[in-house]
Amino acid sequence: MSRVCQVTGKRPMVGNNRSHAKNSTRRRFLPNLQNHRFWLENEKRFVQLRISTKGMRIIDKKGIEVVIAELRARGEKV
């Protein structure tokens, strides 16, 4: 399973660790992904999404039905 938010599309990005001596080594910045179950009232079932915490805030703002409709319009299986 890839580390990609299903709502926002956030992915890991790369950067550098910086020591006190300014040495740099490559590292990855991972998104804060959570597996979360949401109840769909109109379908009478749970859906499990792998979403970032920003994706959770978007769902709180728009509502889960609207977000699921947008995912299905993009062709993502939910």
UniProtKB/Swiss-Prot annotation:
Pfam families attached to this UniProt entry: Ribosomal_L28
Disordered, as annotated region: 1-23
Keywords: Ribonucleoprotein, Ribosomal protein
Any one of the GO CC terms: cytosolic large ribosomal subunit
GO molecular function: structural constituent of ribosome
InterPro entries for the chain: Ribosomal_bL28, Ribosomal_bL28/bL31-like_sf, Ribosomal_bL28_bact-type, Ribosomal_bL28_sf
Domain of life: Bacteria
Biological process according to GO: translation
Protein family according to the UniProt entry: Belongs to the bacterial ribosomal protein bL28 family.
NCBIfam families: L28 (TIGR00009)
Protein name (Swiss-Prot/TrEMBL): Large ribosomal subunit protein bL28
Organism: Shewanella pealeana (strain ATCC 700345 / ANG-SQ1)
